[in-house]
Amino acid sequence: MNVEKIMQGLEQKHPGEVEFLQAVREVLESIKDVYNQHPEFEKAKIIERIVEPERITTFRVPWVDDKGEVQVNIGYRVQFNSAIGPYKGGLRFHPSVNLSILKFLGFEQTFKNALTTLPMGGGKGGSDFSIRGKSDNEVMKFCQSFMTELYKIIGPDMDVPAGDIGVGAREIGYLFGQYKRLTSQFHGATLTGKGIEWGGSILRPEATGYGALYFVHHMMETHGLDIKGKTVALSGFGNVAWGAAKKATELGAKVITISGPDGYIYDSEGLDDEKIEYMLELRASGNDVCQPYEEEFPGSKFFAGKKPWEQKADIYLPCATQNELNGDDADKILANKPLCVAEVSNMGCTAEAVNKFTAAHQLFAPGKAVNAGGVATSGLEMTQNSMRMSWTADEVDMRLHQIMAGIHEQCVKYGKEGDYVNYVKGANVAGFMKVAKAMLAQGIV
C-alpha cells in the first residue's frame, strides 16, 4: 500500500477536508503492514472503497424563531459504511459542523462500531444549528424541521442516529416525536439516547465516560498499574466528562480539573459527588462556561483561556472535542511523566500530539477504542427495543464492562510491539480487519 499516493488522490478529491484527511491518514499508516499481507484486499480495492462514504445527504432546514423570522440551517447525514450492520452514529448540532468533520466522525465511527463486535455500521450527521441562546420552542421547531427530511433515510434496519454535541435527551425527544408523527409508527430502535420512560437505556448518558474509565482501568492493569489513588486531569464538563468523572471517582481516582471554552478549573481537593453533579447544572445553564464552578466551590481556581494539560496529573483524559490537545500540550503532559493518556473525545489529539505520545512509548489510547462505550450502550438500547425489554443498571453496566474489556483485548492483540502496546495501531487494525472481511464477503458494492 502506498499511503502517500492514496492520500494525494484523496486530497485532490476532497480539498480542504482537514479533519477527514487526518483521520484517514492515521488509519492507513496503522494498517499498511497488515493490508500488504492480504492481496485479496488490494484486488477488491477495499481501501479505495472504505475511505468513501456510501451515501451523503445534504438538505436545508428552515424554521421560524420566536420573533417570527425565518431561519435556514444546513442538515447532513453521512452514511459511511454498512458492511456489518445499519449505519449508526450521532447527530451533532453546532456552528462548527461541516462535511469534513462529519466525514471524519463517520469514518471513525465505522471502526469504533466494529470494535464493539455489535452489528452496527458507521454514520454521522448533524447541522450548523446552535442550541445556545435558543428557547425550548425554537429548539423543538428546528428539530421537527430537521427530522422532516431526515426521516426519509433512517430506520431500525437502515440508519439509527443518536445524540452528540448539542443533541441531548431534549433534542432526541423532539426528533423522535416528529419521526413518530411522520411515520405513524413507534420504532424505538430508530433513535437511541431516548428517555428511560419511552424506550431509552439506563446508563446511556454516563456510558461514554464509564466505558472510557473501564478501558483505562484495563490499560493500567495490563501494565501493572492501579487506578486507585491516582489523579486525573480531564477536559470538558458535559455528559462525557461527567460520566468519566463519576466512574473515575468510583474507581478510587481523584479528578482535579474540568474545562470549558472559557478556560479550566483546578480543584486540588478533587471532585466529590456534589461537584460532579454540579457539572450537569453548568451544562444545563446553556452558558457553556465553567467559571461559575469557582464561585460555587471556594478553594478551586479558574484559569481563563487556558487548558488543563499544564497541570500535573497521573492520567490525562481529553473529553471535550476533536483536536483539543495539540503538540505543545503533549510536550507539557510528557514533561509531567504521566502514567496514561486516553482520548475520550473523538480524535481529541492532533496527529502531532499522537505521534509524540507513541514516539515516547507513552501509554496512550485513541478515541475510537476509549469512547466506544457510548455507541456500545446505544447498541444495547437497540437490542432492548427489539426485544421489548428493559435491563437494569447492573445488567447494562456488566455488558458495557464486558464490551470494553473485549475492545482492550483486541487492541493488545493487534498493537503489541515488544513490551509496548501501540493502542492506536491495535484499534485501527482490529476495526479495519472486521469491516474489510465483511466488505470482501459481500462483493463489489
Residue positions per predicted region:
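Adenosine-phosphate binding glycine-rich loop
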Residues: 2-23, 219, 334-445
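Phosphate-interaction motifs
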Residues: 59-120, 124, 128
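Conserved active-site and cofactor/substrate-binding residues in soluble primary-metabolism enzymes
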Residues: 1, 15, 19-22, 26, ...
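Glycine/serine-rich phosphate-binding loop and adjoining beta1-alpha1 elements at the start
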Residues: 94, 113-228
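Rossmann-like adenosine-cofactor binding region
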Residues: 263-364, 369
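Structured beta-strand/loop patches that form or line metal/cofactor-binding pockets in enzymes
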Residues: 40-69
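Glycine-rich phosphate/diphosphate-binding loop of Rossmann-like nucleotide-binding domains
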Residues: 195, 200-312
